[in-house]
């Protein structure tokens, strides 16, 4: 009995339809979730909240972000919010979360894409650059007003906002709060899988 030959063009067409359908579903889901999250977050927002030094505080941690919360995966959005506060460009956290909701990794359960952070900063008038070469981090950081140090390791990742103390080589760390240097940050995270730096002027 002769076997029917498989029409490779039909197979490719079906696969493309499936892929494009999945992409469309993911996009629609992201948009829907961001709208729902914004409505929930906006109801609880208090304009009196200033700089956020800890995303795990009771009045912050339960804000919705993707399918998770700010306390779990919102360090990127918090870094953006804090820069806007420091620059007196007060933007409500729910608005920033809504913008970041379109740049999530796996519906926000893995945080925010660095490129989304970068595009947000540039859109709001900052000279922001993303760097991968760790050997240049120290020099680049000294020429920047703010830095966002990004690391990813076995136990997860974090976006740490660093504010340059212009009279020294030290930085004020926000979320978590403290004083550090770029060399200390690199040494502390030397065994992480990913180390990136966003410089902001």
Name what the model sees in each region.
Residues 2-105:
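Active-site-adjacent structural segments surrounding the nucleophilic cysteine of cysteine proteases
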Residues 84-201:
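Conserved active-site-adjacent core of cysteine acyl-enzyme catalytic domains
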